[in-house]
Amino acid sequence: EEHLKELLECGIDVVTLGNHYAAKKEIFNFIDQYDCLLRPNNLHESIPGTGTNIFDCNGVKIRVTNLLGKAFMNGVIENPFDNIQDILNYEEKADIHIVDFHGEATGEKYALAYAFDGQISALLGTHTHVQTRDYRVLDKGTAYISDVGMCGSYNSILGTKKEEVITKSWTGLPVIFEQVEHGDCLFSAVVLEFDDSSFECLSIEPIYEVVGEEEL
């Protein structure tokens, strides 16, 4: 919870989770207290928290939805296609609807984006930690990227110490991964531009910036 509070104090409005949503069991002690903390929406209905919500941004209603992909993922995961359709059919309408699709398979991400092209404002892929270069606005107006990328250590393997990942990959032995806490940092993100009146998505642009430790 202290990490969540720190992010919110930095000016972050919404935090979306992914397949490791339950890695720290303590999250279930406070997840219902924060409307801005979204776990995947297509989990079993008994799991605490929510995965979609509307936020007011200077009078503009922005819905953010967090979903898990089914391809190569473990656990009980409901169909993400049905889940989005239910949101569109039964939930309150918003001016802008951004979907964070946390999944392994690029094909599944493309399929979901094309299936709801023009019905959601943006589908932003996450999970692989590596930013892709396929950002675009689809024919009917939905912004898309297969993976936004990560924020973390630049000289690492997906944010963890290189030596540990190499050992596990080489020998197959179990290894406890540790995050790199010092050195240059990588900041990955995207910027979405919307029309002020129609809320049509005009563009999506990636940010991929390496920041030296001395600049932090």
Residue ranges and their predicted role:
Residues 1-216:
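Acidic, metal/ion-coordinating pockets
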